[in-house]
């Protein structure tokens, strides 16, 4: 009677492993080949990169080294009087180092990068021009606003000086018993007038041969009225003083305008 087989023994396991010996072996071979191909591709890329680096290094070294006498072109230059290390040109201020090479490594066409650079510079220049024009317009608008404000302030100041002159003229004329002003606008008009008085005054103004006062500007009225005050009453509204005589007025008053008193 044969001995009972031990399924856990090495002989049984080895027999079972050898049932299909080709299947796992093929899988291992394919995996090894795949790894080997990847390694070869990586080595090839590294080798190509190293070749490019070596080419660049050799090129840089060659450009840094001066040409020797064995170079035919350099020998011809020497015969023409050129010396090694000498700058080009009659004045001797030309370049000494060789013109560097710009190796193109990208895939874009020739001139594409320079075109992009030129367009970028144009966009930047247009942006700067717009900013400059905007700043100019803002400065112009601010200056116009200041001028309008100054003009308005000057107009208000002139109107204030005219009212002061009218008030002073009315008081000084009254001191001399002058009942009617030389011109209607020399005195301040009453704040409240009846409609009949206004209509009568309008008729009188229409009958006058001279130009109506409305044709005069505030500045013109002020100049006329201050001249009347100085001539008739020896009075200056900016000094606020009635002088004794014309000599006293001319000696102590700075002048007939507001600017003279600034």
Swiss-Prot record:
Compositional bias annotation for Basic and acidic residues = 28-39, 50-60
Residues in G-patch domain copies: 69-115
Alphabetically sorted, this entry's keywords are: Centromere, Chromosome, Coiled coil, Kinetochore, Phosphoprotein
Spell out the Pfam families in the cross-references. DUF4187, G-patch
Where is the protein situated, by its record's location annotation?
Chromosome, Centromere, Kinetochore
Please provide, in alphabetical order, the Gene Ontology terms of the cellular component aspect for this entry: kinetochore
Specify residue ranges for compositional bias: Acidic residues.
192-213
Q: Which GO terms describe its molecular function?
A: nucleic acid binding
Residues in a coiled coil are 28-61
Disulphide-bridged cysteine pairs: none
Annotated positions of the Phosphoserine modification: 115
Where is the segment annotated Disordered?
A: 1-60, 189-216
What is the superkingdom listed in this entry's lineage?
Eukaryota
* Protein family membership: Belongs to the GPATCH11 family.
For this entry, the protein name equals: G patch domain-containing protein 11
Query: Taxonomic lineage of this organism?
Result: Eukaryota, Metazoa, Chordata, Craniata, Vertebrata
Q: Which gene encodes it?
A: Gpatch11
């Amino acid at each position: 009677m044969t001995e009972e087989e031990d399924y856990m023994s090495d002989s049984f396991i080895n027999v079972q492993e050898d049932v299909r010996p080709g299947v796992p072996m093929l899988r291992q071979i394919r995996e090894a080949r795949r790894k080997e191909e990847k390694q070869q591709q990586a080595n090839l890329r590294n080798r190509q990169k190293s070749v490019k680096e070596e080419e660049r290094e050799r090129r840089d070294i060659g450009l840094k080294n001066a040409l020797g006498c064995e170079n035919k072109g350099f020998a011809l230059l020497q015969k023409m009087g050129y010396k090694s290390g000498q700058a080009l040109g009659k004045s001797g201020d030309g370049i000494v180092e060789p013109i560097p090479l710009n190796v193109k490594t990208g895939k874009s066409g020739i001139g594409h990068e320079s075109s992009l650079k030129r367009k970028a510079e144009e966009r930047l220049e247009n942006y700067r021009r717009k900013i400059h024009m905007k700043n100019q317009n803002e400065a112009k608008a601010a200056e116009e606003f200041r001028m309008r404000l100054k003009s308005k302030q000057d107009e208000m100041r002139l109107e204030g000086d005219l009212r002061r002159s009218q008030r002073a003229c009315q008081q000084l004329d009254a001191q001399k018993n002058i009942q009617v002003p030389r011109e209607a606008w020399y005195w301040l008009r009453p704040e409240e007038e009846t409609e009949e008085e206004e209509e009568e005054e309008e008729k009188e103004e229409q009958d006058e041969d001279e130009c109506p006062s409305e044709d005069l500007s505030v500045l013109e009225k002020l100049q006329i009225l201050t001249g009347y005050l100085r001539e008739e009453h020896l009075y200056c509204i900016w000094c606020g003083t009635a002088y004794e005589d014309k000599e006293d007025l001319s000696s102590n008053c700075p002048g007939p305008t507001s600017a003279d008193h600034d």
